[in-house]
């Protein structure tokens, strides 16, 4: 089987991480893959990386919303672009698939749009230099799993309709 297809079929979301950091050179490869995601009209969403101490208060929860992952990458996209959600989602997919190909585990954490629409989130965006028009698409947590690798769930019948 083709190695790329194999990676796509075997990647799983991991919801428990060790404290071990992803080496900088590996993280840079993952981020570069995100930069090369397809996007409408060649407009690439912004990436803000290496947020290891994101405050749970901003996420609106008292527990760790990032499952103990040592690295959080936030994907933002320009809300002025009609394809901002699609563009950012492709970046998220590239990040997670590249991570898997490099032996790093990942998970997409939702609520980025809500987080960065809050006053605390807007303050973080301003601090990081993210333009006001950019909205949060997702948090991509990265690290090394602390438990067993998740098994694939059964796929539903009728996913593909051929006409």
Question: Residue ranges of each PLM-predicted region?
Answer:
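N-terminal amphipathic, basic helical "cap/leader" segment at the start of enzyme domains
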Residues: 1-71, 160-163
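C-terminal helix-cap and adjacent tail motif
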Residues: 4-14, 18, 130-163
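Short, histidine-centered active-site or binding-site loop motifs used for metal coordination
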Residues: 12, 76-79
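Small-aliphatic-rich amphipathic alpha-helix that forms the alpha element of a beta-alpha
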Residues: 34, 73, 80-124
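Short, acidic Gly/Pro/Ser/Thr-rich loop/turn segments
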Residues: 38-39, 80, 147-149
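Solvent-exposed alpha-helices and their adjacent loops that cap or buttress functional pockets
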Residues: 40-42, 64-67, 128-134, 152-153
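Generic beta-strand structural signal
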Residues: 71, 102, 134-138
């Amino acid at each position: 089987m083709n190695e790329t297809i194999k990676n796509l079929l075997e990647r799983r979301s991991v919801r428990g991480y060790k404290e071990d950091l992803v080496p900088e050179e590996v993280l840079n490869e993952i981020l570069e893959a995100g930069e090369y995601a397809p996007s409408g009209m060649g407009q690439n969403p912004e990436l803000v990386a290496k947020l290891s101490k994101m405050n749970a208060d901003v996420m609106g929860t008292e527990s760790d919303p990032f499952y103990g992952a040592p690295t959080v990458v936030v994907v933002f996209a320009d809300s002025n672009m009609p394809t901002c959600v699609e563009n950012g989602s492709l970046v998220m997919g590239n990040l997670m698939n590249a991570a898997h190909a490099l032996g790093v585990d990942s998970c997409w954490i939702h609520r980025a749009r809500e987080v960065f629409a809050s006053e605390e989130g807007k303050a973080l965006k301003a601090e990081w230099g993210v333009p006001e028009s950019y909205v949060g698409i997702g948090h991509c947590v990265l690290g090394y799993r602390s438990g067993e690798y998740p098994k694939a769930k059964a796929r539903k019948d009728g996913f593909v309709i051929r006409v």
